């Protein structure tokens, strides 16, 4: 089986490593000639994982069209803000009837579209039944190190979901399928916003009580938004909901938690982002989630305060104070 992966960041590389481990021939697309050489000649991703050895069957190319042509499956893993342009470029070169798996997370800023809505808007209808979405608690480096990991595979087409589930599932990588595309996407995107808040609390020196509070109320916000958009609330108790939220809020490898942590320590957002090697999706997702919540009339207190901090320079200590002094409420969604 030949598989093309769009995006040679940490997560695209990790998914490629799993698939190559299974014996598939995998090609990553990267814009960088240097990165492609590093993967092809030295079996390492010099930019994102310079300390880890990749499988021999994992190759890289700077030719996007060649990466998707004549493949048996395509995996899409670029930052969500780059997705629309990439799909426009490849849509006439995708082989018919191949599974298309998205691993991107986020909500497009201007249109407020979910990743699935971008795919269905940019690709012809003939491909829609082949689409699926992968999300869950999965740090890339741990996947390459073959640490046992579980994720969700969501598709509106059961046959597609089960086919992708079969292709990905391996001794250390287990997948669960669900028809709830919206729920999986909302959980995967919005947990990054909550992780920024959790990082701020850690940076300010608050304890684990505070982190647990943010995770609990954050899950409440995510579920509320998901229900408004038509998701199954039970999805948010699964890998792409609670699982991903806990990992992203607590794990030191979380880019979004790191952004919040450094903000809590007094650094500016500009300083933080300019020093990072990878995209922290939660920064852009905070803006789009805030706007989507306003549009749909969904109360999202943590998201609103993270927005004030990122886009209006509100002091992190004031953010925490505002959250703790809100009107008292009954527990529940």
UniProtKB/Swiss-Prot annotation:
Pathway: Membrane lipid metabolism; glycerophospholipid metabolism. GO terms for molecular function: glycerol-3-phosphate dehydrogenase [NAD(P)+] activity; NAD binding. The keyword Chaperone does not apply. Its main location: cytoplasm. It catalyses: sn-glycerol 3-phosphate + NAD(+) = dihydroxyacetone phosphate + NADH + H(+); sn-glycerol 3-phosphate + NADP(+) = dihydroxyacetone phosphate + NADPH + H(+). Gene3D superfamilies: N-(1-d-carboxylethyl)-l-norvaline Dehydrogenase, domain 2 (1.10.1040.10), NAD(P)-binding Rossmann-like Domain (3.40.50.720). Pfam families: NAD_Gly3P_dh_C, NAD_Gly3P_dh_N. The active site is at 191 (proton acceptor). GO terms for cellular component: cytosol. Keywords: Cytoplasm, Lipid biosynthesis, Lipid metabolism, NAD, NADP, Nucleotide-binding, Oxidoreductase, Phospholipid biosynthesis, Phospholipid metabolism. Sn-glycerol 3-phosphate binds at residues 105, 136, 138, 191, 244, 254-256. It is found in: Cytoplasm. Its EC number is 1.1.1.94. It comes from the Bacteria. GO terms for biological process: carbohydrate metabolic process; glycerol-3-phosphate biosynthetic process; glycerol-3-phosphate catabolic process; glycerophospholipid metabolic process; phospholipid biosynthetic process. The keyword NADP applies. NADPH binds at residues 10-11, 31, 105, 140, 255, 279, 281. Catalyzes the reduction of the glycolytic intermediate dihydroxyacetone phosphate (DHAP) to sn-glycerol 3-phosphate (G3P), the key precursor for phospholipid synthesis. Belongs to the NAD-dependent glycerol-3-phosphate dehydrogenase family. This is Glycerol-3-phosphate dehydrogenase [NAD(P)+].
